[in-house]
């Protein structure tokens, strides 16, 4: 690490305006457990390159690492990047402030500020240079109903999506390809070549929709590029014999999308999104009249999620949930096996904050228990249909993708040689303990208690909860047993391990969640469970 810092300093001596070097230096400093210095490096990168999305994303980690230690007289915002004249500065800053205040008392205010900043942005619509108002009579009505599906840990979003897939009233694209469609930078790329090239640009950005074997990447959370995502999600071995590849005819899709676009004088990301679904249905010969778009937004970054909320304020949200500690252990299993401590820490914090998201509290939203879907599908599915405003249908009890039999996510620990049983109970019956010791579980179960109570995973015991909160606070200052295992596997001295950036990030987030529970006794913005008669 020290050699890396020295190398970046040399590079900056030769090229003082090298923003990427400052960004990379920030990553190293954060890993070393020097969050203040990392923040300084990211700020320098953003002074040189104000729209540097990666640096805006990276600065969240050191800010989170110091947040729990900042005194009441000090404002976290003093560490934020300063405005250097960027057109998108207010968007980036407001989004950052929203992220840093998830679950806080001022969460609603920061949400409103972020939505306002996004709404004031330039280039949020693109105009049709060849618009002919005489075409208006040919325009077909588009559905206003959109249901967005988000995950929480490993909780079965792929399963639910596959059950919804072939419903005659629902339009949905396969997999999670479009999870970052509403990210401002993605939309800017979409319209960068002008109106006439948008259909081609979409097909290039999402080539995997048209051939599940495509190796072309799609953008995911935190600017990560996902390669071979169609293969990894099992979209290239569908059908009764597992020998079919999901494909869409590009010529048919492009022609239909361009035809639909011609009826509009301008488009924003949401309207274009709806036209894409209409063109997709036409290209796969789905002739059913659709009343709803089911959007597997999955695990979007804050920017994409906020922009979707701004454009589709009436959209409904569904979160798949599962017993929290079991869900968490399953989700971070691969990170743990690779000794990827940063990934483990990030996923634990993500789950603890996502249960307290103001968006789900304000919007029409429900949480669907994986356990209910597995154990009582004939009660749970109709209840969800009623909530979504669609009819129950036999297609809802089979796993499909583009109407073809889907055999499940190959990365799932429950993906057997003969595929997955949609209502098999292996996942929900799996015992906890492969990663988390009893001590680890006790801390996490206490922090997840309000959510577990709301969703019926535990019986209410407020007095014991108060006791548990007090007991776990000093325990959180020590290493978890799973952390000791990673330190041993990676041959890192425990004292040095506790100085790492990921350790500080995890501890600061845990303490922040503990403080909220101590103050309010619950998480104020939790999603509500689906009511099942």
Report each predicted region and the residues it spans:
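PAPS-dependent sulfotransferase catalytic domain
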Residues: 246-397, 405-422, 528-532
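Residue-level recognition of tetratricopeptide repeat
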Residues: 18, 52, 83-88
């Amino acid at each position: 690490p020290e050699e890396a810092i020295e190398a970046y300093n040399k590079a900056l001596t030769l090229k003082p305006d090298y923003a990427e070097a400052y960004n990379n230096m920030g990553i190293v400093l954060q890993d070393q457990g020097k969050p203040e210095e990392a923040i300084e490096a990211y700020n320098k990168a953003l002074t040189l390159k104000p729209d540097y999305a990666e640096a805006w994303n990276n600065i969240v980690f050191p800010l989170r690492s110091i947040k729990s230690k900042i005194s009441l007289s000090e404002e976290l915002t003093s560490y934020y990047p300063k405005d250097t004249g960027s057109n998108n500065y207010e968007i980036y800053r407001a989004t950052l402030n929203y992220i840093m205040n998830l679950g806080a008392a001022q969460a609603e205010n920061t949400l409103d500020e972020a939505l306002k900043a996004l709404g004031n942005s330039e280039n949020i619509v693109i105009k049709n240079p060849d618009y002919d108002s005489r075409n208006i009579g040919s325009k077909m009505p588009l559905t206003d109903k959109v249901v967005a599906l988000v995950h929480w840990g490993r909780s079965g979003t792929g399963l639910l999506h596959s059950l919804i897939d072939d419903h005659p009233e629902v339009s949905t694209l396969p997999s999670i390809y479009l999870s970052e469609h509403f990210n401002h930078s993605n939309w800017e790329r979409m319209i960068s070549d002008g109106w006439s090239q948008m259909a081609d640009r979409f097909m290039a950005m999402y080539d995997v929709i048209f051939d599940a074997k495509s190796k072309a990447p799609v953008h995911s959370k935190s600017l990560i590029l996902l390669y071979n995502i169609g293969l990894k999600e099992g979209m290239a071995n569908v059908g009764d014999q597992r020998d079919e590849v999901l494909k869409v005819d590009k010529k048919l899709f492009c022609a239909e999308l361009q035809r639909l676009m011609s009826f509009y004088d301008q488009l924003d990301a949401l309207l274009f999104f709806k036209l894409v679904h209409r063109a997709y249905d036409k290209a796969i010969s789905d002739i059913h009249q659709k009343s709803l778009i089911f959007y597997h937004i999955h695990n979007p970054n804050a920017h994409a999620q906020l922009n979707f909320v701004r454009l589709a304020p009436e959209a409904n949200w569904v979160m798949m949930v599962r017993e929290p500690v079991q869900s968490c252990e399953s989700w971070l299993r691969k990170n743990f096996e690779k000794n990827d401590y940063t990934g483990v820490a990030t996923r634990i914090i993500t789950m603890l904050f996502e249960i307290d998201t103001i968006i789900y509290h304000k919007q029409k939203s429900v949480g669907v228990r994986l356990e209910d879907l597995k154990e009582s599908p004939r009660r749970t599915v109709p209840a969800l249909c009623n909530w979504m405003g669609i009819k129950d249908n036999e297609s809802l009890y089979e796993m499909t993708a583009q109407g073809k039999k889907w055999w499940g996510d190959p990365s799932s620990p429950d993906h057997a040689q003969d595929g997955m049983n949609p209502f098999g109970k292996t996942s929900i019956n799996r015992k906890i303990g492969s990663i988390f010791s009893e001590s680890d579980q006790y801390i996490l179960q206490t922090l997840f208690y309000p959510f577990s109570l709301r969703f019926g995973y535990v019986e209410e015991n407020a007095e014991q909860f108060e006791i548990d909160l007090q007991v776990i606070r000093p325990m959180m200052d020590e290493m978890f047993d799973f952390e000791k295992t990673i330190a041993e596997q990676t041959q890192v001295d425990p004292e040095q391990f506790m100085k790492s950036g990921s350790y500080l990030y995890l501890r600061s987030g845990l303490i922040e969640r503990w403080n909220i529970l101590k103050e309010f006794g619950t998480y104020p913005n939790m999603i509500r469970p689906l009511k099942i008669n």
